From Swiss-Prot:
Protein's recorded name: D-alanine--D-alanine ligase
Cofactor note: Binds 2 magnesium or manganese ions per subunit.
Enzyme class per UniProt: ligase
Residues annotated as binding ATP: 176-231
Length: 360
């Protein structure tokens, strides 16, 4: 599979990006680079700065870690460009046209817009280079909460109530009655709980819409769902098998400043705990795993996804799907598969091999 002199597969780890999840992407990339088997893989780091410049990436994974609550960023180095020509697939060139490196496969560790939303997947599809994770359609649909829910609902999967705001800031009285209080106001295309507000009084609604709209012109307003927060990973093997991890139960998510699982609570404050496997009865566990796989298939995902649920008194309700979940040391996706018997290094190996063996 490799044309490298070492005989190893060359993996371009692309990270950073223009989204508000830039720093999380950097930490995920550092963990991935540290865990890719050096006997099988050569890592080619490619960073994308917050203003969108593609640059030679950091070679030391330790520099892409969370240190004293300080999140890393891609620094400006010598710029590189990916080739879009299938005759030169996998090549990255410096500004003067000279070759930086040639990759056999791309691992786009990009969270949020301009990376997890199908844009980068489409870019690399132009040159026929294998890419880890879902393709253009699944990535775009998974990034947009409106269309995620529409596709899930069309497949008969359980989703909550929501209203979409495109060019308005107010809800009608009928919509307020439909949703009730509290509601969550979110950017329709975002992640890591950035730009999200929990609204308990309608007089605070406009401010919440303004915050969400700072990250996305389209806003989704969701009814609060009372239940336990449970996550489940999905992994596709090179032979096409799709498996679900043991689920994880999150506790302490309400301790964020806004009363929910916000960015600081996820990555900085160290107050959320996860029970893996989740202490659920066998029937509920199997149902969550089944729904996770069905969600993966409903969006035509490939490779991987993390599916988030609320487990209510009436059963599980799908919250969202992440087509490139976090790979940080505290991220649920690798932890859930480790608890399922798939170690971090093996997980990465499966993902890279799945990308190389699929029909691109």
């Amino acid at each position: 599979m490799s044309n490298s002199n070492s005989g190893k597969v060359r993996v371009a780890v692309v990270y950073g990006g223009r989204s508000s999840e830039h720093s999380v992407s950097c930490v995920s990339a550092g963990a991935i680079m540290a865990h890719l088997d050096p006997e099988k893989y050569d890592v080619i780091p490619v960073g994308i700065t917050v203003d969108g410049a593609w640059v030679v990436g950091e070679t030391d994974p330790q520099k892409l870690t969370l240190i004293d609550r300080t999140m890393p960023e891609v620094e400006h180095h010598e710029e590189v460009r990916p080739s879009l020509d299938p005759a030169h697939r996998g090549e990255f060139h410096f500004s003067d046209g000279s070759l930086y490196a040639t990759a056999d496969v791309i691992f786009p560790v990009l969270h949020g817009r301009f990376g997890e939303d199908g844009t980068v997947q489409g870019l690399f599809a132009l040159s026929d280079i294998p890419v880890v994770g879902p393709g253009v359609l699944a990535s775009a649909a998974g990034m947009d909460k409106e269309y995620t829910k529409k596709l899930m609902a069309a497949e008969g999967l359980p989703v909550g109530r929501e209203v979409i705001l495109r060019d308005r800031t107010e809800l009608t009285e009928a919509e307020k009655n439909l949703l009730g209080l509290p509601v969550f106001v979110k950017p329709a295309r975002g992640g890591s709980s950035i730009g999200i507000s929990r609204v308990t009084a309608w007089e605070d609604f406009n401010k919440a819409v303004g915050l969400a709209r700072a990250h996305d012109e389209k806003v989704i307003v969701e009814s609060e769902i009372v239940g336990s927060e449970v996550e489940c990973g999905v992994l596709q093997y090179p032979d096409g098998r799709i498996v679900a991890s043991v689920p994880a139960l999150l506790s302490g998510t309400e301790s964020g400043a806004g009363g929910f699982y916000d960015f600081d609570t996820k990555y900085l404050d160290n107050v959320v705990t996860a029970e893996i496997p989740a202490p659920l009865d066998e029937k509920t566990t199997e149902l969550i795993q089944s729904l996770a796989v069905e969600s993966f298939q409903a969006l035509a995902c490939e490779g991987l996804a993390r599916v988030d649920f609320f487990v209510t008194a009436n059963g599980p309700v799908l919250n969202e799907i992440n087509t490139m979940p976090g790979f940080t040391p505290i991220s649920m996706y690798p932890q859930m598969f480790t608890a399922s018997g798939v170690a971090y290094e093996e997980l990465l190996d499966v993902l890279v091999q799945q990308a190389l063996h699929r029909d691109n």
